[in-house]
Amino acid sequence: MQTTMNRIHDPAKAKAYFEDKLAFTTGPVELDRWIKAHEDNLVVVDVREEEDYEKGHVPGAINLPKKQWDNPRGLSRDKTNVVYCYTQQCHLAANACVQFAAKGFPVMELEGGFETWKEYELDIEEGATNRLKKGSPQLAERRY
């Protein structure tokens, strides 16, 4: 049985892990820069519950709580979908990324979730401005 200590002494596995981590995660400052640069190949996805989304979210983010993951309307197969949840520890965003990637959507995870976004004192939008309407098959309109 391989223990945690054995794994950390395997430089090849560590290299592969951190290369993947860098490829599939972004930080709050980098995401904020992308949003402000009017990045048109980006969809920001908040997977928290609707009431938490309405209290505040990353500007331009769509809301896609867990109950809607089977039919992930608003995601794009042609853009990078940056997914976030409450905190780094909740793993909701990571689980969403696994499901969305399995359905063919390119994904990244925002490290630290919305809590870290707030700690950096970055812009926050309130209300349900970008929440998708139930039963609506169209993709969310992205305007940064």
Regions found by a protein language model. Name each.
Residues 62-70:
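Glycine-rich, highly charged phosphate/nucleotide-binding loops
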Residues 57-59, 103:
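Short, structured coil segments at secondary-structure junctions
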Residues 44, 61-63, 107-109:
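Conserved beta-strand scaffold positions in the cores of enzyme catalytic domains, especially
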Residues 70, 75-118:
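Catalytic cysteine-centered active loop of the rhodanese-like fold, especially the PTP/DSP P-loop
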Residues 48, 66, 113, 130:
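Residue-level "edge-of-site" marker
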Residues 38-44, 59-60, 80:
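Short active-site oxyanion
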Residues 1-43, 50-52, 126-144:
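Flexible, polar/low-complexity N-terminal or interdomain linker segments that lie immediately upstream
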